[in-house]
Amino acid sequence: MKLAVLAVGHRQPDWVNEGCAEYLKRMPRELAASVTEIKPEARGSKTREQLLAAEKSRIRDAMAAGSRLVVLDEKGDDLTTLKLAKRLETWMQDGRDVALLIGGADGLDEEFKQQADDRLRLSSLTLPHGMARLLLCEQLYRAVSVLKNHPYHREG
């Protein structure tokens, strides 16, 4: 199974890319993970709907066919690390690749939210885009460490 973080946005600072790379390289082989940056649509005189439609097409092109669709959304499930680990375990049992979508400045097309297999919320706080990417990568690694009984995660 592969975990693909698909993030609409511009190039991130080195600390974001290096942090994500560090957590992703720690992932076990059976859970290969990657971050793919999706170029945002140039604003110009386009409406929000036009921007999101163009980005939707780019996201679809980057997704592996048949992937479980997980949307990061402010109204998504607010999970603890242990609950995320259980969710990840369920995804692993399903066997499909997982596409985790992080929308751009204007969010994600509503169709993604409606078709999502899961909707997750990283925080009630508004996070900078790069921080959301890094936090997601770290939490995916932490969830795996819980499942593997690795000492990275200490409970209580």
From Swiss-Prot:
One Pfam assignment: SPOUT_MTase
Cell location: Cytoplasm
Primary subcellular site in the record, as a coarse category: cytoplasm
Domain of life: Bacteria
CDD domains: RlmH-like
Reactions performed catalytically: pseudouridine(1915) in 23S rRNA + S-adenosyl-L-methionine = N(3)-methylpseudouridine(1915) in 23S rRNA + S-adenosyl-L-homocysteine + H(+)
Keywords from the named record: Cytoplasm, Methyltransferase, rRNA processing, S-adenosyl-L-methionine, Transferase
EC number: 2.1.1.177
Record: residues binding S-adenosyl-L-methionine: L72, G103, L122, S123, S124, L125, T126, L127
One GO term describing the cellular component: cytoplasm
Keyword set includes Lipid biosynthesis: no
Gene Ontology molecular function: rRNA (pseudouridine-N3-)-methyltransferase activity
Keyword Hydrolase in record: no
Function: Specifically methylates the pseudouridine at position 1915 (m3Psi1915) in 23S rRNA.
HAMAP family with a match to the protein in the record: 23SrRNA_methyltr_H (MF_00658)
Family indicated by similarity: Belongs to the RNA methyltransferase RlmH family.
Subunit and interaction comment: Homodimer.
Protein name per Swiss-Prot or TrEMBL: Ribosomal RNA large subunit methyltransferase H
